[in-house]
């Protein structure tokens, strides 16, 4: 008999993973600037490696931020507080190489092409996209968070791994770690069980592999994963190399923007390629991806589709998106053309419209930079609101 089961895998990483350190540092700097200058233009990139961090990018602002202080505070919060962890917030070197935003880019953002020859100074009309590009947003009704199950559980496990380190439950854990979850789907595309869980966690030198494996199951996996999803066939790989003492930036260099699939949908939906962290909301890589998630989530919550992927695309210096595309993968209750028309009517997808609609000039970005930008249960971001459901239902009647 033909077995129609399907497996799908996603991963997440802890806040102490080198690439995630870089994301959090970039977004901590962004927040520190936006706190005093909501209209700042920020493109902040971070590189971390043994004993040092390099902060580079383009920033135009009217405020002053003590960048080394922000970097050290962020590294301290993550947990790299002792030299023997391979990275120490107090003794690390911090290099900065910051320029202003290019005036060639600024003129297109400050005054969109459509309004350059007109006298409109209204910000929503005047602001152009900070770059060309394509962005995707996705939602599915397979979990209460409207996220695919594999990435949702991966984030929950990674967060739990960090929590038991920070609260002292497993005080031999160190900040670096990764999680991977493989979900089995039935022939109707419903998730039915967890096939495989992989956990790799940095640890102190004096703890045995057997203790780590036992403790991770007892304190991380079983309290996090619903018991009906685990059975005797579920496979667990916990620190499968046998040892993970050297970690963090000492083990691997980290870069801002190198975990874009972790940040979004775990590979379950398409990705336009642009990262989020370190970018102010005039950068549509970030703001339009948030808007696309907002649109997709409200469409699914309205019962208009079981799955929905939204693509937006922009031209640099132009306010209106050059295209809006919606794919419901055959689950739509109305046509995709109807959905596009409803979206055009009820969502302002110009850059300044998105910023206003989602209140994106707030200093909220550091908390997005670990454990996912979407479907979070510990914090409600503006793009996760379900306040367009009734409008969408009415629009397609």
Curated annotation (Swiss-Prot):
Subunit description: Homotetramer; dimer of dimers.
Gene that encodes the chain: metK
Identification of the protein by name: S-adenosylmethionine synthase
Reaction equation(s) it catalyzes: L-methionine + ATP + H2O = S-adenosyl-L-methionine + phosphate + diphosphate
UniProt source species: Staphylococcus aureus (strain NCTC 8325 / PS 47)
GO BP annotations listed: one-carbon metabolic process; S-adenosylmethionine biosynthetic process
UniProt: L-methionine binding residues: 58, 101, 252, 283
Family: Belongs to the AdoMet synthase family.
Binding site for K(+): 45
EC class (word): transferase
